[in-house]
Every structure is written in C-alpha cells, then in structure tokens.
Design a protein with these regions (language model features):
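A short, structured N-terminal alpha-helical element that caps or precedes a catalytic domain
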Residues: 1-101
Length: 101
C-alpha cells in the first residue's frame, strides 16, 4: 500500500532519469497538465513543445502535471495532485493548461 511519501519518491525517481528539465521562476505560473501517466505524456512531442514554448516566454513558466500511475493511492492518502518540478499542489496555480493530443 503506497503512502504519500512513496508517491513523492516515485516522482523523484522519474526526475532523476530526465535530461533537459526546465526550471524557471516567472511571474505567470502555469500547471501544464497531461491526462495520462508520466510515460505517455513525456512521449508526446506536442506536450514537450508546449512546455518548451511556455518557458521561452520571458514572463511565464510551466510545471508539469500527469495523471497519477496509482490514482487510488492519491485518493487513499489524500495527496493533492502536484507538479513534477516543485511538488506544488495544482490547486495553487493561477492557470491550468491541458494538452490532449
């Protein structure tokens, strides 16, 4: 049975294998959501392009959000959906963007 700590550790393992992760502080923060698990979302060239384009804008930054691999664990532990870059709760973002292609 996964705990909230396990959910965050899973995110950290995924990030450890990444290359080219973008980190930026900007006035406009956007949670860029993909309605599928991490591996599907990161295979989407459209999603990656939108992520990069947002970061090219001087006043905006994007943090990635994916459908959890284990949705039931999030519900059971009452873990809010959070971003990959900062583990910030999606509910705290002023803007949500969705990539569905």
């Amino acid at each position: 049975m996964a705990s909230a700590r396990d959910l965050h550790a899973h995110r950290q393992r995924l990030l450890a294998d990444e290359q080219g992760t973008l980190h930026k502080v900007a006035r406009v923060r956007i949670a860029l959501c993909y309605p599928s698990p991490y591996h599907v979302g990161m295979s989407s060239l459209g999603y990656q392009t939108i992520y990069r384009e947002i970061h090219l804008h001087p006043g905006a930054s994007a943090e990635r959000v994916f459908l959890p691999d284990d949705v039931e664990a999030y519900r059971r532990t009452r873990t809010p959906l959070f971003t990959f870059e900062s583990e910030a709760a999606v509910s705290g973002f002023p803007m949500l963007a969705f990539s569905v292609f």
